[in-house]
From Swiss-Prot:
InterPro entries: AAA+_ATPase (IPR003593), ATPase_dyneun-rel_AAA (IPR011704), CbbQ/NirQ/NorQ/GpvN (IPR050764), ClpA/B (IPR001270), P-loop_NTPase (IPR027417). It comes from Bacillus subtilis (strain 168). Belongs to the CbbQ/NirQ/NorQ/GpvN family. It holds the Pfam family AAA_5. GO terms for molecular function: ATP binding; ATP hydrolysis activity. SUPFAM superfamilies: P-loop containing nucleoside triphosphate hydrolases. This is Uncharacterized protein YojN. The gene is yojN. Keywords: ATP-binding, Nucleotide-binding. The lineage of its organism: Bacteria, Bacillati, Bacillota, Bacilli, Bacillales.
Length: 304
């Protein structure tokens, strides 16, 4: 790593005023060489929160070898936080997107037939869990509570003090390389989710990730969206605030209040009328006609 990168990293860490030993641990990760094939898996920073403790505590937990579970509503920035952590630790992050169809092969890997010099051989292709463990990288499990409960026990040994797993397809015992860490995310109350069983939940340090609001949201929209009209952005911030209230009251689903959807909408509003942008970026993502009407009503009061 060059001197400029080292100075940049040091500045980031001083901004958070992390304990000296934690800073040194992060700087040591920064010095470790990363194989070119994994360089693109290192996340980019950019997560913002009103409460600095969210990022601070996540860094401390990961640096101490803890597994971190990010809990929060849809679009509150959990994935962006995970990418920011990957950036701070300068670690590639292998991702698993959970669904009811998730199986052991999607986690661990699968066998395939390869043709070498005219001979058919069976090879094992590593999955994200296997790669992250062997390389000492981060593993990100998104929407972990979307997976079927019977799929997840394969991770129990990976997530406890042993940090090991027996590959069910090859019999290989895999012990995680130093530096391996797990970040998972859940959307509570989301359709299709199931409660995490206590044995799995107890393997994590849990960090709540709420929606961002007000001036901080304005900074995010100004920096991360194509829209630069401050007056228009202020109206979108009011829209977001109203939608968060309605989502908390159960009048609209969390998708309507998603910060990710709001950024998409602001991007569109840089080129098309705001209400049409809201239709494309927020309203049409909703399934319930009453929710669509509620969002449209708010939009009509804020935008001509």
């Amino acid at each position: 790593m060059n001197r400029k990168g080292n100075l940049s990293m040091t500045t980031q860490l001083q901004h958070l005023t992390l304990p000296e030993d934690i800073q040194q641990k992060l700087l040591s990760y920064k010095e470790q060489p990363i194989s070119p094939e994994f360089q693109s898996l290192i996340g980019t920073s950019g997560y913002e929160a009103e409460d600095e403790a969210i990022l601070f505590d996540a860094i401390i937990a990961l640096a101490m070898g803890k597994n971190v579970l990010l809990k929060g509503p849809t679009g509150s920035g959990k994935t962006k936080l995970a990418e920011t952590l990957s950036s701070y630790f300068h670690k590639p992050m292998h991702s698993v997107n959970c669904s009811v169809d998730l199986d052991a092969e999607a986690l661990v890997g699968y066998k395939t037939i390869e043709n070498q010099s005219g001979q058919a051989t069976i090879e094992f292709v590593s999955g994200p869990v296997t790669k992250a463990m062997k390389e000492g990288h981060f593993l990100y499990i998104d929407e972990i509570n979307m997976a079927k409960p019977e799929t997840l026990p394969i991770l129990n040994g990976v997530l406890d003090y042993r940090k090991m797993m027996t590959n069910p397809f090859t019999g290989e015992v895999i012990r995680a390389k130093s530096g391996f860490g797990v970040i998972a995310a859940i959307n509570e109350g989301y359709v299709g989710t199931v409660p995490l069983n206590e044995a799995l939940k107890n393997r994590f340090v849990i960090i709540d990730v709420p929606y961002i609001k007000g001036e901080l949201l304005k900074q995010v929209l100004m920096s991360q969206s194509a829209l630069k009209d401050e007056k228009l952005i202020d109206r979108f911030i009011t829209l977001s605030s109203d939608l968060i209230v309605q989502a908390n009251n159960g009048q609209v689903s969390e998708e309507a209040a998603s910060i990710r959807a709001l950024i998409d909408t602001c991007d569109l509003a840089a080129y098309i009328p705001p209400r049409r942008a809201i239709e494309r970026g927020i309203v049409e993502k909703l399934d319930d006609d009453r929710e669509k009407a509620a969002v449209r009503n708010i939009a009509e009061t804020l935008f001509e």
